[in-house]
């Protein structure tokens, strides 16, 4: 049996599909595709699948992936890609299908590009002069304060037409995961930049030794 990684982009209207609904979408698409994916056993068999790192509602991504299994001996992955894209909902595009090379638990960081309207650049630049950026990370059990400057010491601003954007990489491991929305919320509270004006795009995952996860 082969474990297969389906890598896809998730943008525009698809960014508002929740994880639970995304699981349903993938189950439905894989069933309709007729591809030889493996189903779990038992009274309620369903397609085996695991997602690497859930994406928050409203955020876009160029690097999402879901792992499935197949008992096919020589899968035609180009045909898999074509079959899936033919029936994917708008905003979801499969860009690669191949056997799993790295296990999902190797992910240590998630990298993003956060964009604002270009006139926000002078305000964003003020972040770099701050000595401390404490934010509250909430979980089901507790709330703790995290020093964001440890992970985002400065914003490296780039202009792109009517937008200004900056790249960041945040922890995304089993030990600690930080959502970029924490930074966006801080920028709104501290500098008055509306969170609704920010566009968050996940660009890649990194391992602990900063290799690109694939």
Tell where the protein language model's regions lie, with residue ranges.
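Hydrophobic, proline/glycine-rich low-complexity stretches
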Residues: 1-8, 14
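Short beta-strand-to-loop capping motifs
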Residues: 8-10, 68-74, 114-119, 168-172
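N-terminal ordered "arm"
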Residues: 14-39
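Short, charge-patterned binding micro-sites
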Residues: 38-68, 101-103
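Ordered, amphipathic secondary-structure segments that act as subunit-interaction surfaces
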Residues: 61-113
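Short amphipathic alpha-helices in soluble, non-transmembrane regions
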Residues: 78-88, 123-131, 182-184
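Short, low-order "capping/linker" segments at domain edges
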Residues: 104-119, 153-154, 207-214
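Core RNA-modification/binding signature centered on pseudouridine synthases
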Residues: 132-214
């Amino acid at each position: 049996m082969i474990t297969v990684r389906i890598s896809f982009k998730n943008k525009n209207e698809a960014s508002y599909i929740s994880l639970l609904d995304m699981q349903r979408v993938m189950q439905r698409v894989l069933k309709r595709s007729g591809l030889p994916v493996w189903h779990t056993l038992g009274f309620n068999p369903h397609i085996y699948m695991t997602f690497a790192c859930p994406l928050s509602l409203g955020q876009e991504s160029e690097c999402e992936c879901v792992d499935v299994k197949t008992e096919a001996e020589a899968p035609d992955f180009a045909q898999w890609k074509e079959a899936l894209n033919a029936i994917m909902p708008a905003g979801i595009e499969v860009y690669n299908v191949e056997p799993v090379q790295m296990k999902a638990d190797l992910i240590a960081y998630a990298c993003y590009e956060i964009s604002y309207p270009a006139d926000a650049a002078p305000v964003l630049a003020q972040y770099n002069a701050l000595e401390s950026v404490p934010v509250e990370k909430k979980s089901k059990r507790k709330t703790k304060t995290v020093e964001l400057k440890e992970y985002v010491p400065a914003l490296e601003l780039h202009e792109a037409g009517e937008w200004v954007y900056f790249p960041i990489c945040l922890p995304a491991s089993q030990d600690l995961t930080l959502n970029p929305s924490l930074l966006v919320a801080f920028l709104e509270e501290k500098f008055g930049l509306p969170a609704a004006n920010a566009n968050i795009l996940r660009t890649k995952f990194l391992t602990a030794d900063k290799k690109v996860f694939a």
